[in-house]
Amino acid sequence: MKKNSPLVSIIIPCYNASYYIKEVLESVHQQTYPEIECIIINDGSTDTTLDIITNFKNSHFHIYSQENKGLSDTRNFGLEKASGDFVFFCDSDDILPATAIESLVTPYTGQENIIIGKTANYSWETKKIISYLPHLDEKQFFENKNSEILTLNIIKNLSPIAQNKLYKTEFLKEQNLKFLSGIYHEDELWFFETIFKAENVLFIPDVTYYYTTDNSHSITKNHNDKNLYGYLSVIETIYNKYYLQFPQREIIAYYIAHLKKITIGNLKNHSNYSNEALQQMESTFKKVNPEFKKNINLKNIEKQYFIYVNMLSLKDSATIKKEYFNNPVNSLRKWFKILMFSIFNKK
């Protein structure tokens, strides 16, 4: 690898992206950093996506087409084809600022496994930035010896998207990191696994990604049983593959509770989950019941909150909804319960 000019492989999976993909590819074409290759995979599109990407002329663009396999398998295919020193994932409806890759590569010192930029929520229709995903305001480097970034994510609720992160290819290969096939919310698991195993991670304050928020076909807009099953698969995988196998059980336990909180939170606006899916949630939550210890870098009230969330998750789905949402003073009541639980456990 050339330290000052490493090759970056930008991986773009495409499925029925004809409305967006030309502008996305233009944003890659306009990158100020010259050492890039773009791997574009048509994942069985039924619209004109393949025609558009085939007609886009750029010697650095490598185009592949396959039967529909889903996002995880398509990204994994991109990883197999990537020849860069780094890989960068971009969705087929998102935009890269012209200096995105240059901003991510420039601070590389030779030791970072992952470099993370700031993500802007972007309206495709108005071409304006709406807001920003949670991020660190200043440039910050982590050796991550005690999984500090997982703790940071629990506190700050950092976005777990796979995009807008420069991953060192050697690191991904050494750790045999791939996306779990056949589930929704594969990014949640990918974020956990990559951050858990990374030794050196750099956050930079530069905006290096425009994340489209008004695509009605995004899975964040379409909530059904697969959505719930996806979260449950992530929780079970982390529990079985990491909590039961690695010594860092304390942080993993709290991270599982963090994911349970997200899963429970989705119940409020997505009440159309089937009874079978809710029963599966109850079964998974009861099976995944980690032990919580307090020698972790969280404030006591935060620890008690996640312990409370885990306790709540062991109840039936109707009780979970009632406890978490139905009372108009839910927020005050919830924090009162946490406070009382904290006081009780000090005695």
Positions of predicted regions on the chain:
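N-proximal low-complexity "stem/linker" segments adjacent to membrane-targeting elements
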Residues: 1-29
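Acidic helix N-cap motif at the loop->helix transition within catalytic regions
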Residues: 19-22, 36, 47-55, 95, ...
